[in-house]
Amino acid sequence: SSKTEIEIKDFIKELGINLPFICENGSAIYNLDLINKKLPKKVILSKNIKSISRLYREKVPLRIRKKIIDLRKINDVEQIKIFGLPKNKIKLALKRSFTIPIKFNDDIKDKKKFIKIIKDTGLKIQEGGRIMNLGDNVDKSLAMQIFLKNVKTFIKDPIKTIGIGDNHNDIGMLKNTDIPCLVYSESFKGKNIKIKNLIVSDKPSPQGWADVMKKAVLKI
């Protein structure tokens, strides 16, 4: 998930169960030990947020940084509008260990230049609908593969993976799952995505997530 560790922990607490999970776009894996006690409780794949912030300040020219809004530093009203979350959930979304949520406030030419600088620095920009996330060179697909490698050490039965996404930062993951599912989104319709056997919903979230999940389960 692109969500933070604390967001996901809050969600699984509401569900009343404990689960392994991947957070912040593949930055870390938690609770592998629930599958087998010999597996680690935590696997960190990303640089920490302090290191990423330092590289950002050192490598990105001030002229471009002035066009970038750090969404952790704007007022509550703007945060609620941009994230589309209630105030109590915003606090959880901003408690980040590995990524910085940002918005780019200028022309496409400078945005492309910024993304190139970040890539050359060894970091990565992942776009997820309302916001961009600045983080290390990791993603959901890489974390998923590491997760499966660990799990397959102890589970010898065949494993089928279901990937569900609704945005740019989900494409790599969907390409590497057995049953890929794309939820309809106004901001990302994914018309040109070429993924074999892709299940696509007709409706947006939350109904779209339920629809593709039902179809995916029937394919297992």
Task: Give residue ranges: language-model regions.
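Hydrophobic/aromatic ligand-binding patch that stacks against planar heteroaromatic rings
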Residues: 11, 79, 172-173
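Conserved acidic, metal-coordinating active-site core of Asp-based
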Residues: 63-162
